[in-house]
Amino acid sequence: MASASGTMAKHEQILVLDPPTDLKFKGPFTDVVTTNLKLRNPSDRKVCFKVKTTAPRRYCVRPNSGIIDPGLTVTVSVMLQPFDYDPNEKSKHKFMVQTIFAPPNISDMEAVWKEAKPDELMDSKLRCVFEMPNENDKLNDMEPSKAVPLNAAKQDGPVPKPHSVSLSDTETRKLVEECKRLQGEMMKLSEENRLLRDEGLRLRKVAHSEKPGSTSAVSFRENVTSPLPSLLVVIAAIFIGFFLGKFIL
């Protein structure tokens, strides 16, 4: 490690790392948690890289090595395996990105690393940080999802109104038809009443020409036909009450 620290002083890391110092993993850690590490090559030469960790059984790294062409960026996915998180236990896991300028002819990557001289190697270290979302974050995440049904309810509230309007239109149409029917009935009754009145007048004229004793029959006929105007008034009152009652309700 002393030689590695010496090389750090001699050769600064050529790659630009994002993030530069910390790899953050956000829980819960009951499933695989992935974070990305971007490696950018700002130089005009090809750069070989290798990603190492102090806890190889806890992480899966893809790709864990390769070559980056000049001006290009490679994204490395670091996958933390599920584990029982203890907030009192601080993570001691670390990663190291080791790099070397690629030789002109590369036939075997393993041979390149084995034959590399210490002063040719460059490396950067990153520490792992575990973050567990607190209760406030959970509430903030839940509030928008709760707000959606409320807004939807507000939007859905006025929807039944067109339905109620259509019902009133239907009811009005029925009332109009009922009105027409009742008007027809009233016209028939009026016509019958007129005929009965004419018949009454005719009988009255006949009575004058007949004996005085026959007036009782004429008066009897008049008493029979006299309730018809009252009947028309009652029917009209019932019709008006029915019509107004339907509209008020």
Curated annotation (Swiss-Prot):
<keyword id="KW-0965">Cell junction</keyword>
<feature type="site" description="Involved in binding the phosphorylated serine of the phospho-FFAT motif">
    <location>
        <position position="50"/>
    </location>
</feature>
<protein>
    <recommendedName>
        <fullName>Vesicle-associated membrane protein-associated protein A</fullName>
    </recommendedName>
</protein>
<keyword id="KW-1003">Cell membrane</keyword>
<dbReference type="GO" id="GO:0070972">
    <property type="term" value="P:protein localization to endoplasmic reticulum"/>
</dbReference>
<keyword id="KW-0256">Endoplasmic reticulum</keyword>
<feature type="coiled-coil region">
    <location>
        <begin position="169"/>
        <end position="205"/>
    </location>
</feature>
<keyword id="KW-0007">Acetylation</keyword>
<keyword id="KW-0597">Phosphoprotein</keyword>
<keyword id="KW-0175">Coiled coil</keyword>
<feature type="modified residue" description="Phosphoserine">
    <location>
        <position position="214"/>
    </location>
</feature>
<feature type="modified residue" description="Phosphoserine">
    <location>
        <position position="216"/>
    </location>
</feature>
<feature type="topological domain" description="Cytoplasmic">
    <location>
        <begin position="2"/>
        <end position="227"/>
    </location>
</feature>
<dbReference type="InterPro" id="IPR013783">
    <property type="entry name" value="Ig-like_fold"/>
</dbReference>
<dbReference type="GO" id="GO:0031175">
    <property type="term" value="P:neuron projection development"/>
</dbReference>
<feature type="modified residue" description="N-acetylalanine">
    <location>
        <position position="2"/>
    </location>
</feature>
<dbReference type="InterPro" id="IPR016763">
    <property type="entry name" value="VAP"/>
</dbReference>
<comment type="subunit">
    <text>Homodimer; disulfide-linked. Heterodimer with VAPB. Interacts with VAMP1, VAMP2, STX1A, BET1, SEC22C and with the C-terminal domain of OCLN. Interacts (via MSP domain) with OSBPL1A (via FFAT motif). Interacts (via MSP domain) with ZFYVE27; may retain ZFYVE27 in the endoplasmic reticulum and regulate its function in cell projections formation. Interacts with OSBP. Interacts (via C-terminus) with RSAD2/viperin (via C-terminus). Interacts with IFITM3. Interacts with OSBPL3 (phosphorylated form). Interacts with KIF5A in a ZFYVE27-dependent manner.</text>
</comment>
<feature type="domain" description="MSP">
    <location>
        <begin position="14"/>
        <end position="131"/>
    </location>
</feature>
<dbReference type="GO" id="GO:0005783">
    <property type="term" value="C:endoplasmic reticulum"/>
</dbReference>
<feature type="modified residue" description="Phosphoserine">
    <location>
        <position position="166"/>
    </location>
</feature>
<feature type="transmembrane region" description="Helical; Anchor for type IV membrane protein">
    <location>
        <begin position="228"/>
        <end position="248"/>
    </location>
</feature>
<dbReference type="InterPro" id="IPR000535">
    <property type="entry name" value="MSP_dom"/>
</dbReference>
<dbReference type="GO" id="GO:0043495">
    <property type="term" value="F:protein-membrane adaptor activity"/>
</dbReference>
<keyword id="KW-0472">Membrane</keyword>
<keyword id="KW-0812">Transmembrane</keyword>
<dbReference type="GO" id="GO:0005923">
    <property type="term" value="C:bicellular tight junction"/>
</dbReference>
<feature type="modified residue" description="N6-acetyllysine">
    <location>
        <position position="125"/>
    </location>
</feature>
<dbReference type="GO" id="GO:0005789">
    <property type="term" value="C:endoplasmic reticulum membrane"/>
</dbReference>
<dbReference type="InterPro" id="IPR008962">
    <property type="entry name" value="PapD-like_sf"/>
</dbReference>
<comment type="similarity">
    <text>Belongs to the VAMP-associated protein (VAP) (TC 9.B.17) family.</text>
</comment>
<dbReference type="Pfam" id="PF00635">
    <property type="entry name" value="Motile_Sperm"/>
</dbReference>
<keyword id="KW-1133">Transmembrane helix</keyword>
<feature type="region of interest" description="phosphorylated FFAT motif binding">
    <location>
        <begin position="50"/>
        <end position="53"/>
    </location>
</feature>
<feature type="modified residue" description="Phosphothreonine">
    <location>
        <position position="170"/>
    </location>
</feature>
<keyword id="KW-0796">Tight junction</keyword>
<comment type="function">
    <text>Endoplasmic reticulum (ER)-anchored protein that mediates the formation of contact sites between the ER and endosomes via interaction with FFAT motif-containing proteins such as STARD3 or WDR44. STARD3-VAPA interaction enables cholesterol transfer from the ER to endosomes. Via interaction with WDR44 participates in neosynthesized protein export. In addition, recruited to the plasma membrane through OSBPL3 binding. The OSBPL3-VAPA complex stimulates RRAS signaling which in turn attenuates integrin beta-1 (ITGB1) activation at the cell surface. With OSBPL3, may regulate ER morphology.</text>
</comment>
<keyword id="KW-1015">Disulfide bond</keyword>
<feature type="modified residue" description="Phosphoserine">
    <location>
        <position position="219"/>
    </location>
</feature>
<dbReference type="GO" id="GO:0005886">
    <property type="term" value="C:plasma membrane"/>
</dbReference>
